[in-house]
Regions:
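A metal-dependent, Asp-based hydrolase signature
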Residues: 54-134
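An amphipathic alpha-helix signature
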Residues: 25-33, 46, 104-112, 130, ...
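Asp-based, Mg2+/Mn2+-dependent phosphohydrolase catalytic module
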Residues: 1-7, 38, 147-155, 162-281
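Short, charged/polar micro-motifs that form catalytic or ligand-binding hotspots
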Residues: 14-19, 139, 166, 219
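Short, acidic loop-to-helix structural element flanking the phosphoryl-transfer center
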Residues: 11, 104-108, 135-163, 199
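Short, surface-exposed acidic
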Residues: 35-49, 118-130, 183
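Active-site neighborhood of HAD-like aspartate-dependent phosphohydrolases
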Residues: 1-65
Length: 281
C-alpha cells in the first residue's frame, strides 16, 4: 500500500464506519411496522431484511432499485445489468433515463427499502429513525465506543481529517458527542447529502490545492462514500462485514473496525517512514 504515503486528506463516514452495529435493523423495521402489520408479517419482513444484508437472497447489497416500480438491478459501475422483481425472479429490463435508481448500500438503506415496500408514512419512518438512533446510545442497545480507533486517528500527522455523515442534526452530533470525537477531526459535515455532498467536498478540496491521489475516503456505503472519490481518481476503503455485489476495485477493503484500526496504523507507519526518508535526503 505505497499509496498511503501520498494521502493528505482522509474523509470518514460515521455510521457503520466509526462504529459497527447491525442489530438496530430489526428494531427499526419493527418500529415502522408496529400497529400496521401483524407480528407474523413483521417477523417475516425482518427475516427478509437480514437475508438481504447477509447475501442470502437474489437481491443483495450493491444492487440498485427503482423507487417507484421496486424493480431491482444488478449493476456494474452503477449501470444496470440484470433486472429482478421483489421475489428475486429475473425480469425484463424496464429501466430508462427517467428511472430514479437507489443503491442498496447498508442496513439503513435496507430499512428505507422496507418502508417503501410497506408504504410506511414518511412521518412514521422519520420517528422510527430518530427513536432507534436514540436507543443506540442507551445502555440496553449501546453502540461500541472504539477508543483504540480514535486514538490511532488522532496520531495522524499532517493530514486534513474530515467527518461527513448523512445523519442530520441533532442525532449526528449526539453520536459524535457520545463517541467523544469532537476534537478528532478538523471538519464536520452533518446531513451531508452524499453522494452529491462528497462531490461538492471534492470540488472544495481541489480548489484548496489537493490532488485526487492525495484523498482517501472511508465508508460502508459504496455509492455515498466511495464512488465519487474513486471516479475522481482518489483512494477508497470499504468497511463492511457483509459483501456487496459490486465489482469495483476499491483501494482497500476491511470487514471490521479492527481492520480499520490496522489500516490507520499503516498510515501512521507510512508517515514515520516518510520522515525517515526525508531525513536521509
Amino acid at each position: 500500500m505505497q499509496w498511503l504515503k501520498e494521502i493528505n486528506v482522509v474523509i470518514f463516514d460515521l455510521d457503520g464506519t466509526l462504529y459497527q452495529d447491525y442489530s438496530f435493523l430489526e428494531r427499526y423495521i419493527s418500529k415502522m411496522m408496529t400497529d400496521r402489520y401483524s407480528n407474523i408479517e413483521i417477523a417475516e419482513t425482518i427475516r427478509w431484511a437480514y437475508d438481504v444484508l447477509e447475501g442470502k437472497k437474489a437481491i443483495k447489497l450493491g444492487f440498485l432499485y427503482d423507487s417507484e416500480s421496486l424493480l431491482f438491478y444488478s449493476q456494474q459501475n452503477l449501470k444496470p445489468v440484470s433486472s429482478f422483481n421483489w421475489e428475486g425472479l429475473e425480469t425484463a429490463m424496464q429501466v430508462n433515463e427517467k428511472s430514479r435508481l437507489v443503491y442498496i448500500g447498508d442496513p439503513w438503506g435496507i430499512a428505507h427499502l422496507v418502508a417503501k415496500k410497506k408504504e410506511i408514512p414518511p412521518s412514521v419512518g422519520v420517528k422510527a429513525f430518530y427513536d432507534v438512533r436514540a436507543e443506540m446510545l442507551t445502555e440496553a442497545y449501546c453502540i461500541s465506543k472504539r477508543t483504540d480507533l480514535f486514538e490511532e486517528i488522532q496520531k495522524l500527522e499532517n493530514k486534513h481529517l474530515i467527518l461527513m455523515t448523512n445523519s442530520p442534526l441533532p442525532t449526528g452530533q449526539e453520536f459524535v458527542d457520545f463517541l467523544e470525537i469532537n476534537d478528532t477531526f478538523d471538519e464536520f459535515f452533518y446531513n451531508g447529502k452524499k453522494p452529491r455532498g462528497i462531490e461538492m467536498l471534492l470540488e472544495k478540496l481541489t480548489e484548496q490545492g489537493y490532488q485526487p491521489h492525495e484523498i482517501l475516503s472511508i465508508g460502508d456505503h459504496p455509492r455515498n462514500d466511495l464512488y465519487p472519490v474513486h471516479r475522481a481518481g482518489g483512494h477508497t476503503c470499504l468497511i463492511s462485514q457483509y459483501a456487496h455485489e459490486d465489482t469495483t476495485a476499491w483501494s482497500a477493503s476491511v470487514k471490521s473496525v479492527d481492520g480499520l484500526v490496522s489500516l490507520i496504523k499503516k498510515m501512521n507507519e507510512s508517515e514515520i517512514q516518510n520522515r525517515k526518508e526525508e531525513g536521509y535526503g
